[in-house]
């Protein structure tokens, strides 16, 4: 697991002129999803589409809303689910977003390393 901070922006996919201000998030390879403050997402016009349940490290179960946004950090962007974080939650950049960015995480230098996307051969799908 690797954790360090970067600045991330969420862009409204229906109106790309609407976006959050840059938010300092933890790059957390132990977290599946990316989380940003609820109020900032709503201000950017990003709307909740449903709810997800999470089992936290402290053994607590919580439920949070999620929506869809274009996420941008360190010159990379991807369309992804974003969790609407409450004030008690951390802002996170999770592995699903990292995969969308097509990057690996360098723990030592705390940076992203570009990796090529690997296509699946058609005969594997047959």
PLM segments and residue spans:
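Pepsin/retropepsin-fold aspartyl endopeptidases
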Residues: 1-126
């Amino acid at each position: 697991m690797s954790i360090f901070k970067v600045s991330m922006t969420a862009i409204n996919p229906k109106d790309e002129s609407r976006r959050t201000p840059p938010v300092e998030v933890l790059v957390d390879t132990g977290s599946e999803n990316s989380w940003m403050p609820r109020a900032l997402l709503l201000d950017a016009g990003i709307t909740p589409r449903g709810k997800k349940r999470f089992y936290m490290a402290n053994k607590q179960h919580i439920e949070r809303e999620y929506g869809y946004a274009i996420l941008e950090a360190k010159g990379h962007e991807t369309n992804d689910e974003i969790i609407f974080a409450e004030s008690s939650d951390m802002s996170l950049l999770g592995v699903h977003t990292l995969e969308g960015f097509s990057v690996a995480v360098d723990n030592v230098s705390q940076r992203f390393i570009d990796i090529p996307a690997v296509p699946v051969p058609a005969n594997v799908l047959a």
